[in-house]
């Protein structure tokens, strides 16, 4: 059971109380314990092994299977190159495919050069006969090759963890007749249509082979369509025509094929006791400094498009990143700029305080999501080897080390403003402070009991597995969530019926 959630919570939720369950810990996968723990799985009589995603990825698939998978990918690209050349396709497309092929060949050579490690227990040796993957959308970046060019919406990123999962799914299909893998997710398609094809490759690979759709372009020609439309430019000024792979075609046939492996349940069908939600879209007017900075972003983008600036010096990724920071707070770009009233952060603080005061009798709690300007880790202090020397120790105490001023962060700014308005510091917490499973468990317990009333965190750290909804009444999005799975942490089942609020400060056109 690879899970992205807190593993102890997953064990408690297991439906069979008398089952013999093994739950992994971080210590189990430390370098000197990993082999022993894998042997324990292989030789033990367990009904289920609950394991974290990162730990699951550290159990290797056999070298022979990795080599076979890489050779299949190389052959697929070789066939694609031959097709493009035979049809008189663009030379640029051929070069792209050849670069990808060389990269895969280098990976294959490296794998072969590593040699065999006889002491490593592989996934095949564990004796696993079923694989249940929670939050399976974390494995959406599977290798994908296409002859399409200049088409947005095609996710071709190859993550090692996804390739590893694909190899393990193929193995499970072999030993179970394609009935050994179960994926669970609330967002099978988060930000790219290619993700549906990816799920089918994980769960329906043999079926795709029967239909001659193991190559993405064959699948896309039957079920996808490219659309050209005007879009707002990344720098936030003006529009541009953009072709995207963004529309499904032959949707009934696609859904019939997908439903061969998918059990789809919508919120209406489940009818769970979720709270009634009141949404607020808060608009913050840009300051004069922000308006001037947006003009500067536009000028930088024009130079990038014209090719007059070196990509290592400036590029659209940097410009977009600066635009996101600027959209949240101008002090992230320059801490010396003034803290002006009416900004996103100040409006958010006012909302938090009002809801905090209104919820005093019931100790109602709030979540604040912010993925930019997160808390910085305290600088590590170097300790001298001769620290136990009494003279040195006395000198160190007599001459205090000057403290470096902390860099500006939105998190700390919000905390200080809440404290200044009368909120006890003990009722405010950052998810980043809970850097171990034990601390995270304690923090969540405090939020559920109302001891911590405001919890700030990023989507990555406070997303999946954060079940603190007992007294939760409001959620604030300071920056715009990028994916559907990032939205709705407050929309969970409750033991008590109540109304909740979702405040979105996140829409930025820079």
Which residue ranges define each predicted feature?
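Conserved helicase ATPase core of P-loop NTP-dependent helicases/translocases
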Residues: 33, 37, 412-415, 419, ...
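Conserved helicase motor "Helicase C" RecA-like lobe of SF1/SF2 P-loop NTPases
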Residues: 372-430
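Inter-lobe coupling linker of SF2 helicases/translocases
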Residues: 8-10, 34-81, 86-130, 161-194, ...
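Conserved helicase motor
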Residues: 9-11, 24-34, 52-58, 371-373, ...
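Conserved nucleic-acid-binding Ia/Ib motif block in the N-terminal RecA-like helicase ATPase lobe
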Residues: 1-9, 15-43
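SF2 helicase motor core recognition
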Residues: 52, 56-63, 125, 139-140, ...
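Conserved RecA-like ASCE P-loop NTPase motor core of nucleic-acid helicases/translocases
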Residues: 364-372
